[in-house]
A protein has these predicted regions:
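N-terminal helical cap/lid subdomain that shapes the substrate entry/recognition surface
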Residues: 2-118, 125-126
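Short beta-strand/loop segments at the ligand-binding rim of alpha/beta enzyme cores
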Residues: 128-130
Length: 243
């Protein structure tokens, strides 16, 4: 179930006194910004399929996670390594079954936030170029395509495909280059304060989105970097662009 602020069912753009004067492009994170995914079934079904305990599976996935995120390992290679490290023969059929189940569960449990498509459509109608900039492993491009995001984005810069992950400067710069814009012409939105800081350090106007609403502020505001706007909906991000 998605958590949104009161009244978020209707897409209304707030008015801000000041807009980003030169904003021409939008860089948007994927997970917990435009979409969410319930990974509970991953934790229940994949360890059982692998013949491991939940603890063994989680430890293994955490170990391979950074390499998956920058494309140094495929899911098949990573899962084979988890099996091997736990004394299980990485039989190709078992590895393929794990990869297929992981993909199936990602596609089945990924959900857009209600304001995601209206936000992307509104930006396109205003001629604002869009890049999805996500730290992710293989499967996310297919998920974004299935959910209708790929059709509305001008480009998708995925860490597993470009070999760099937020908050490294390279991934933001790759998105800027693909959209043909300078950092000063961009607005970036992400839920993670560290990733917001990485963008802000390049001169990109940045917003941290708190999907649980104003009540989340007390727990997270301390981690919001200086100069980063806190927002609770994508409508607020749209309002950061000049009318």
């Amino acid at each position: 179930m998605l958590t949104t602020r009161p009244g978020a069912g209707q897409y209304e753009t707030p008015n801000y006194d000041q807009h980003v004067a030169r904003a021409e492009i939008c860089l948007a994170d994927a997970y917990q910004t435009i979409l969410t995914c319930d990974f509970a079934e991953h934790g229940r079904l994949l360890p059982a399929l692998a013949g491991l305990t939940l603890e063994q599976w989680i430890a293994g996935v955490r170990q391979i996670g950074p390499a998956l995120n920058v494309g140094q390992l495929t899911k098949a290679e990573g899962f084979a390594g988890v099996l091997r490290d736990n004394g299980i023969d990485p039989d190709p059929e078992l590895v393929r079954a794990l990869v297929d189940k992981d993909r199936e569960l990602l596609l089945a449990n990924g959900r857009l936030y209600p304001d995601a498509l209206p936000f992307l459509r509104a930006l396109r109608e205003r001629g604002i170029k869009i890049a999805i900039v996500s730290n992710c492993s293989e499967g996310t491009r297919e998920l974004l395509t299935e959910l209708g995001v790929a059709a509305l984005a001008d480009t998708m810069v995925l860490s597993c495909e470009v070999g760099a992950a937020k908050p490294a400067a390279e991934i933001y710069q790759r998105a800027l280059k693909q959209l043909g814009a300078a950092a000063e012409a961009a607005v970036f939105v992400d839920d993670q304060p560290g990733f917001c800081a990485g963008a802000a350090a390049l001169g990109i106007t940045t917003a941290q989105i708190l999907r649980n609403g104003p009540g989340e502020t007390a727990a997270t505001a301390e981690g919001t970097p200086d100069g980063v706007r806190v927002v609770y909906s994508l409508a607020e991000v749209e309002a950061m662009f000049p009318a």
